[in-house]
A protein has these predicted regions:
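Conserved alpha/beta-domain cores
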Residues: 2-214, 222, 234-236
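Short low-complexity, flexible loop/linker segments enriched in glycine and/or proline
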Residues: 75-77, 242-245
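Gly/Pro- and small hydrophobic-enriched strand-loop and loop-to-helix capping segments
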Residues: 224-242
Length: 245
């Protein structure tokens, strides 16, 4: 009886999150439909993901290559998978080959990763892959991502040197304790303004993926177009064994 209770709780939690997203969107002068909610399902079983899928959700995220490659074939093809973890360059081919319905890679933090993804897309004959450039807005050495001062350079590299990638926007991960969240998000907003001005893009053509379980409402109020929600929907992570990227 325990499993149905947990799965029911995930669907209830999803509806609560979507309600909060709608309220935050309205406070920022937008609609819920303008905000993507990526349900991050790392360490969670396929059966639980299926429950959330059956409730109408379609955007899901995973942090580990092996996990998403294992799960994706067991789930419906109309899921839009987002890879939201740190991607090692030698895993790009495995990721793309194993997940035909991979919609986006969030977290291109250097030219090497961009080049490997571009080559993998070309070799597999896939349509151009949407990517977000990851910006390290908190300055933490433990985090991936480009320094804000180098953001424009890698965006230009993706747009000019990677014909099989589609630059879709920017992403960042705030501080774990959310102490500097407003500053982190403001930095990403500044990066977007710089990129759009330099490239002649409208700002609404450049997505902002910022905001997680503990700060997604504030992120939306500050302009986020995509939030990554894991534990608030699925419950605490279950690390039965060490995950490998």
């Amino acid at each position: 009886m325990a499993a149905p209770t947990v799965e029911g709780a995930a669907v209830t939690a999803l509806r609560s999150v979507l309600h909060r997203v709608r309220q935050a969107a309205e406070r920022s002068g937008r609609t819920q439909e303008q905000i993507r909610v990526v349900a991050v399902s790392k360490t969670k079983p396929v059966s639980l993901i299926r429950q959330v899928y059956d409730a109408g959700h379609r955007s899901f995220g995973e942090n580990y290559v092996q996990e998403i490659v294992d799960k994706a074939p067991q789930l419906p093809e109309d899921i839009k998978w987002h890879f939201v973890g740190h991607l090692q360059s030698n895993k790009a081919k495995t990721l793309l080959g194993g997940v035909p319905n991979l919609d986006m890679v969030e977290g291109v933090g250097n030219e090497k990763i961009a080049n490997h993804l571009d080559k993998a897309v070309s070799n597999l004959g896939r349509k151009p892959l949407k990517v977000l450039v990851q910006v390290n807005t908190s300055g933490e050495e433990s985090k991936s991502g480009i320094d804000p001062s180098s953001c424009l350079g890698i965006v230009e590299h993706v747009r000019l040197r990677c014909p099989n990638l589609e630059f879709a926007g920017l992403m960042t991960i705030g501080m774990p304790d959310y102490t500097s969240t407003p500053e982190n998000f403001r930095t990403l907003l500044n990066c977007r303004a710089e990129v759009c001005k330099a490239l002649g893009m409208a700002e609404d053509q450049c997505e902002l993926s910022m905001g997680m379980s503990g700060d997604f409402e504030q992120a939306i109020e500050m302009g986020s177009t995509s939030v990554r929600i894991g534990s608030t929907i699925f419950g605490p992570r279950e690390y039965a064994k060490k995950q490998q990227n």
